[in-house]
Amino acid sequence: RMDIYFPKSGTPTAIILSCPGGGYTFTSIPNEGVAVANFFVPRNIAVAVLKYRMPNKHEEVPLSDAAKAMEILRDSAVVWGVPTNRMGVIGFSAGGHLAATLVTKFPTQKSRPDFGILVYPVISMDETITHKGSCLQLLGDNPTQEQRVAWSAEACVTDNTPPCFIVHCQDDKTVMVENSIRMYQALTKHKVQAEMLLLPTGAHGWGFSKQIAQKEVFESAMMKFIYQNL
């Protein structure tokens, strides 16, 4: 299911697909979906909030949903008058893993986002830094090393990965900040445009509806990144 939010008037300058978090057990729609739309729509950016299927140890399911959603949005953009090269994805926590997977493992060119925004994302399935609950739901109880690598976004970055903006709090006790650091390093290695903002405090799960210190710094940097990639 995908709920789409449009500006009240005029043609949107871009469309962003929002992938809420929830540890691959549910989708945190209010905080990381509706609140996302409430932020972007007044800035003339349409938002599609994706309620993707849970993997239940079938790792390909969420990516299939996200890729299909991006293809639908790109096809629909022609009708809506939105340039088809202004299609981004934003993801939070486990939804950040889904967004990172989409920007690195997009199954078709049409499903490739033009930019990605990763907010306190789960990136790696490496057992030393992964979010164990997300890994369990995605890969099951005893994933092979091959599975861990295949679904670690940092291991899937290529020269064709789109530009990414990453934000994480250093005091995040739910998803280790090393996830974002590894993703940034992989993007840099492949010379992909990347920006990473590390905030000293804020913990996890604040989304777009909760205030944290330096929230305005994040919002300003993120919007600058988006405009640079439109």
Regions found by a protein language model. Give the residues of each.
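Active-site nucleophile elbow and catalytic-triad environment of alpha/beta-hydrolase enzymes
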Residues: 141-156, 161-162
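Short beta-strand/loop motif that positions the catalytic acidic residue
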Residues: 160, 166-168, 172
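Conserved alpha/beta-hydrolase "acid-adjacent" motif
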Residues: 173-182
